[in-house]
Design a protein with these regions (language model features):
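Conserved beta-strand signature within the Rossmann-like core of class I S-adenosyl-L-methionine
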Residues: 138-146
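Core SAM-dependent methyltransferase catalytic element
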Residues: 194-214
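A short, conserved alpha-helix within the catalytic core of class I
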Residues: 119-131
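Short "lid" loop at the C-terminus of a central beta-strand within the Rossmann-like core
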Residues: 118-119, 145-153, 192
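Short alpha-helix
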Residues: 162-181, 185-187
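Class I SAM-dependent methyltransferase SAM/SAH-binding core
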Residues: 46-48, 54-101
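Conserved class I S-adenosyl-L-methionine
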Residues: 1-42
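A short acidic, Gly/Pro-enriched loop at the edge of an enzyme's catalytic core
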Residues: 100-111
Length: 214
């Protein structure tokens, strides 16, 4: 059953990314890029961009010195990520993989950054904390996602409360007993105006989290 769900998700995202246009544009997520720009890429660094779709965040990060890696469900997303990387004369490693099935190397990444990584809560509660164990000591986790109050708004995001983020709930998961020891650099629920193609456009309610592993 889990494999069937992955296949269905992959087919959906392959269709979403099938146009020559980039579904969410070619520019990195604004808030993610602002936070990551404040972190100096260490020598021989590794940066992971989960669910980065067509690779806009990972490609941007590669242009400022990060060794970017992506995993996502879509083979079409992988192909478009590599095209975007070629445009910017950088390289990005991209695995077609699923959060719940992926094996994460321990203490390997200096940065994990994601935008709009919405998964069912039963998967998120187990596997997002598990992913954090792949951060090195001092490594950063940066994310932006739609808040539960996004439901009535028409600026993007899933129309399921289970897929949206409640700040207290997700923060409890990311800093709880299943996660490594993390400390909070920034957390917020805020209103913002999105302009990431027609799919993410207009006034939106978002959760923003920046953590660092002890």
């Amino acid at each position: 059953m889990a494999d069937d769900k992955v296949k269905t998700g992959a087919e959906m995202w392959d269709q979403r990314f099938s146009s020559e246009e980039y579904a969410y544009g070619k520019e990195a997520n604004v808030w993610l890029s602002e936070r990551v720009s404040q972190i100096n890429p260490p020598p021989n660094n590794r940066a992971l961009f989960p669910a980065d779709g067509e690779g806009r965040n990972a490609v941007w990060a590669a242009t400022i010195g990060w060794n970017s890696e992506v995993f996502d469900l879509s083979i079409v997303g992988k192909q478009k990520c590599h095209l975007l990387a070629q445009e910017h004369a950088v390289s990005v490693d991209y695995d077609v993989d699923d959060l719940a099935l992926r094996e994460f190397p321990q203490r390997s990444y200096d940065l994990i950054a994601c935008s709009w990584f919405h998964t069912p809560s039963e998967i998120r509660k187990v596997h997002m904390p598990r992913m954090l164990h792949s951060l090195k000591s001092g490594g950063h986790f940066v994310m932006e996602g739609y808040h539960t109050s996004q439901m009535p708004l028409q600026s993007g995001g899933p129309k399921s409360l289970d897929l949206l983020f409640d700040l207290d709930e997700v923060l409890g998961e990311l800093t709880g007993e299943k996660a490594p020891q993390m400390h909070i650099i920034h957390i917020a629920v805020t209103s913002t105006v999105l302009d990431e193609s027609e799919l993410h456009k207009g006034q939106a309610m978002v959760v923003r989290i920046h953590l660092q592993r002890d």
